[in-house]
Regions:
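Residues that define the transmembrane beta-barrel architecture of outer-membrane proteins
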Residues: 29-31, 59-65, 103-109, 123, ...
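Transmembrane beta-strands of outer-membrane beta-barrel proteins
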Residues: 31-35, 86-90, 123-131, 175-177, ...
Length: 401
């Protein structure tokens, strides 16, 4: 089964006030359940969504109904206090779009994180991150579903970003309203896959199984600041659009030849500027097997993949990087530009200098980390990049949060 986790960084300004519970009787984080409804529309980002489909109608209705199960933190851990007591958990949803004949009836499973921008005694302004998978799509098929260039596989990643306002309306009951941006894509593992994006307001109701009232924390929190050099390696596979998926006689036979391997090596310097974040920059080296490659068919009708010299030559780039730290999790964003690469003729006509990386990593003991990113060129997803690495740290000193 395809395992895709999209990932995505939100950089929000948060102030330095921290919070804790006003009741010593609460000994653990608070379990809660929520029901949530979204109703919105699709962004007209490709021809299929704009109306070039079997119905000759734009896709303009998006409905999602979710059940969420999570924990509201209460400030037992320092990271909970620093982030003003966020909530996290898992969600399940069903999705309905006004073109079921070509899109299907997808459903999704995801993890969520509700970060706090500012908290009052009975309410909070929050940002939301949801990462997971969506299943049961009707995807592109040259014979039965030829117009659907938006979804290339039955399983896709689901990436959702949002902003909301949460309000205590009764004891243990919360009402939340806000808006979401939701993206579905398979990260170029199977093409055509233009992806599809939705914007939708939402409302949700939550029940907490304990008291939720909070008050500011007065305890001062210190943490060691450090500098570090991170070294990581990454890997992904992708499928490129070429004549095969447009030719029914070739697609079924030679589809495996359309899979290309991508390897990355990344090294960067990072400085922890506060307990919640790091910034820095570095060098990215990428080897992309697809560059300049061809699929050739000989006189006997046998196909083979022919790699060019570009497939074995590095793409070297420089980038700026930021990490938002949430306990042992880092939300990563890189923005950079390629400074060296050899081009095939086709690439030179369509070359893209900028690259982006959005993802999440987890820090294990001994400064080892592993994660998954969306690695993009010119804001277009190139691969889902699985990676692991090591952070060499030095010059530690105590700093304010």
């Amino acid at each position: 089964m395809m395992k895709l986790f999209g990932a995505l960084l939100i950089l929000l300004i948060v102030n330095n006030n921290t919070w804790a519970t006003n009741s010593d009787s609460i000994k653990s984080n608070i379990l809660f359940i929520s029901v949530k409804g979204n109703y919105g529309t699709a962004l007209k980002s490709n021809d299929f969504v704009r109306g070039q489909n079997a119905n000759n109608e734009a896709i303009d209705q998006f409905k999602e109904f979710s059940a969420l199960f999570g924990l509201q933190t209460i400030g037992k851990e320092e990271w909970e206090q620093l982030h003003k007591m966020p909530a996290y958990g898992i969600g399940l949803s069903v999705i309905r779009i006004n073109n079921e004949a070509e899109m299907g009836k997808p459903f999704s499973a995801y993890g969520f994180y509700h970060g706090v921008i500012h908290r009052w005694s009975k309410s909070a302004l929050r940002y939301d991150v949801e990462l997971g998978l969506a299943f049961n799509w009707k995807c592109f098929d040259l014979q039965s579903n030829p117009y659907n260039i938006a979804i290339g596989s039955k399983i896709t990643s689901r990436i959702c970003l949002g902003l909301d306002y949460e309000l205590l309306i009764a004891k243990n009951c919360m009402l939340t309203f806000g808006g979401n941006f939701t993206h579905f894509s398979n990260g170029a593992i199977r093409k055509p896959n233009k992806g599809i994006n939705f914007v939708s307001p939402f409302i949700s109701f939550s029940y907490l199984f304990d008291n939720h009232e909070l008050k500011p924390l007065v305890t001062d929190i210190k943490k060691e600041q450090h500098h570090e050099v991170q070294i990581s390696v990454g890997y992904g596979i992708k499928q490129e659009e070429n004549v095969l998926w447009q030719n029914p006689e070739l697609t079924s036979v030679y589809e495996k030849l359309q899979k290309y391997h991508v390897f990355t090596l990344k090294t960067n310097y990072m400085r922890q500027y506060c307990q919640k974040g790091k910034w820095g920059g570095g060098v990215n080296i990428c080897f992309d097997e697809w560059r300049g490659s061809e699929i050739r068919i000989d006189a006997n009708g046998k196909a083979r993949k022919v790699l060019s010299h570009c497939s074995h030559e590095p793409i070297i780039g420089l980038f700026l990087s930021h990490e938002l730290l949430i306990s042992k999790v880092g939300i990563v964003t890189d923005l950079g530009g390629n400074v060296y690469m050899s081009y095939s003729h086709v690439e030179y006509q369509n070359r893209k200098i900028l690259f982006e990386r959005l993802g999440v990593k987890y820090y294990f003991p001994y400064n080892i980390f592993a994660g998954v990113n969306v690695f993009a060129n010119g804001v277009k997803a190139n691969i889902i990049e699985w990676n692991m690495g090591y952070a060499l740290q030095w010059h530690k000193r105590s700093v304010d949060r």
